[in-house]
Amino acid sequence: MPHQKILMLFGLLPVATNISTWWNFGSMLLTCSMIQVLTGFFLAVHYTANINLAFSSIVHIMRDVPCGWMVQNLHAIGASMFFICIYIHIARGLYYGSYLNKETWLSGTTLLIMLMATAFFGYVLPWGQMSFWAATVITNLLTAIPYLGGTMTTWLWGGFAINDPTLTRFFALHFILPFGIISLSSLHVLLLHEEGSSNPLGTNSDIDKIPFHPYHTMKDLLMLTTTLTLLLMTISFFPDIFNDPENFSKANPLVTPQHIKPEWYFLFAYGILRSIPNKLGGALALAMSIMILFTVPFIHTSKLRSMTFRPLMQLMFWTFTSTFVLITWAATKPVEPPFISISQVASIIYFTFFISNPILGWAENKIMKNT
């Protein structure tokens, strides 16, 4: 059969029989990246990277281009779906100990940073009020770097303030970075298949494996169909659910919004940044909130890979997950009590997860040794 020849590569790929739905998100991320590249190309055809025309070109895409509203919403809401999938993908990796495949985990964390950079540059492109001010606040953090900060900021802006050169280079970066993401994704998958994926038990599954096709292709397609249905329903019925009302106004450097905030998927890092009153301290905490993922494979001390049989780590993991949601919510609120205190406490708990990981692993080993 012709389709069997096409899928022979997948058929020859042995996968554990007991992997759950949480392992579907890798293929979903691949689909998301394909959607983003395709819709991004069609948007780039009509977009104008000029501060006087950028906002108007977005309006033109939405109103005049055939199906432009759908392409634009697919790209914008598709980015939110991308981040939902990647956060679940990372959470699964943390819970089931997938990070012990070090090369795969480190390449994946690098991918996350590249994806966040790409999304940030993309958020600036419509040149709406919130786009402009979010870009001003975030890029200004570079000035906190001793000695080099001012020069780096001027170089990034292409002048002494955010202006036309800034928008041009942000568009160039937003266009080129996805190709780097695709290349690194290929390496990520290649490194994963060197060792093979883990499973919910965290055990060696060599004795109990099945072909990827047709079993897991069907399983992936079901989840993919469900997610794409939700995406299209959101685009059709709630197209502005993730948009900030301020961004429907053209950027005005003379009027500051009452409350500056980036897109929802950056709010956990932005909340940690805001919770520290010192500029350099906040910038370091912002960087560490993502960079700390690089340390996870090296601080694992438990003899058990997965958290399935580690109740104390399960408690810490779900505390960490709820803290992530709490910081995201608090970052949407103005910088005033009680939101400042909530963000500060939540930020401490966020980093405590990574500190407690090796300590609890060591304690579990002691308990197992003594029983």
From Swiss-Prot:
Record-level GO cellular component terms: mitochondrial inner membrane; respiratory chain complex III
Entry keyword Protease: no
Cofactor(s) essential for the protein: heme b
Binding site for heme b b562: 75, 174
Any single GO BP term: mitochondrial electron transport, ubiquinol to cytochrome c
Keywords annotated in UniProt: Electron transport, Heme, Iron, Membrane, Metal-binding, Mitochondrion, Mitochondrion inner membrane, Respiratory chain, Transmembrane, Transmembrane helix, Transport, Ubiquinone
InterPro entries registered for this protein in UniProt: Cyt_b/b6_C, Cyt_b/b6_C_sf, Cyt_b/b6_N, Cytb/b6-like_sf, Cytochrome_b, Cytochrome_b_C_euk/bac, Cytochrome_b_N_euk/bac, Di-haem_cyt_TM
Gene Ontology molecular function: any one: ubiquinol-cytochrome-c reductase activity
Cofactor binding, note field: Binds 2 heme b groups non-covalently.
Spans through the membrane: 25-45, 69-90, 105-125, 170-190, 218-238, 280-300, 312-332, 339-358
Binding site for a ubiquinone: 193
Coiled coil: none
Pfam family, one: Cytochrome_B
Binding site residues for heme b b566: 89, 188
Membrane topology term: Multi-pass membrane protein
Stated family: Belongs to the cytochrome b family.
Remarks, miscellaneous: Heme 1 (or BL or b562) is low-potential and absorbs at about 562 nm, and heme 2 (or BH or b566) is high-potential and absorbs at about 566 nm.
Function: Component of the ubiquinol-cytochrome c reductase complex (complex III or cytochrome b-c1 complex) that is part of the mitochondrial respiratory chain. The b-c1 complex mediates electron transfer from ubiquinol to cytochrome c. Contributes to the generation of a proton gradient across the mitochondrial membrane that is then used for ATP synthesis.
Oligomeric form and interacting partners: The cytochrome bc1 complex contains 3 respiratory subunits (MT-CYB, CYC1 and UQCRFS1), 2 core proteins (UQCRC1 and UQCRC2) and probably 6 low-molecular weight proteins.
Name of the protein in question: Cytochrome b
